Regions:
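A short beta-strand-turn-helix
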Residues: 9-27, 57
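C-type cytochrome heme c attachment motif
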Residues: 35-42, 98-101
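Short active-site neighborhood of thiol/selenol oxidoreductases, capturing the structured segment around
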Residues: 23-37
């Protein structure tokens, strides 16, 4: 199974917002360099792909990925690349990778973080600390 399908990811923030509003969930927007950014890859492997995080996220978060791969074989469609570029212009001007942004269903930013050497439970608590 490909890592991209291990976690249910939205690729469009507007669709994610609609889902968050309908399901009363928090949005977690992740800027990633999936094939070149070592901390992004660790975050994917250690947190996003963990059973524990996936189970929690399914009920509490709408996960959105804005990926910026560099290898030709991982190249995004021009439309997706444009969407990701627009998200970066709005939410990640400094170009931090990974950048994890926690938002409410109205796209109000509640907090920002990145890779942390935490267990999945610890990372869930870390993300929730922005919400409460």
């Amino acid at each position: 199974m490909s890592a991209i399908f291990a976690q249910e990811w939205q690729l469009d923030l507007n669709e994610a917002q609609e889902k968050a509003q309908n399901e009363n969930k928090i949005i977690v927007l992740v800027f990633s360099g999936s094939d070149w950014c070592a901390p992004c890859i660790k975050l994917e492997k250690e947190i996003w792909n963990s059973e524990e995080f996936r189970a929690y996220a399914k009920n509490n978060f709408v996960m959105v990925r804005a990926d910026f791969p560099r290898k030709k074989e991982h190249k995004l469609t021009p439309e997706q690349q444009q969407k990701n570029n627009q998200l970066a212009e709005k939410y990640n001007l400094q170009g931090y990778f990974p950048l994890v942004i926690v938002m409410d269903k109205n796209l109000t930013i509640l907090g920002k973080t990145g890779y942390k050497k935490l267990t999945p439970t610890g990372y869930i608590e870390h993300l929730n600390s922005f919400i409460n």
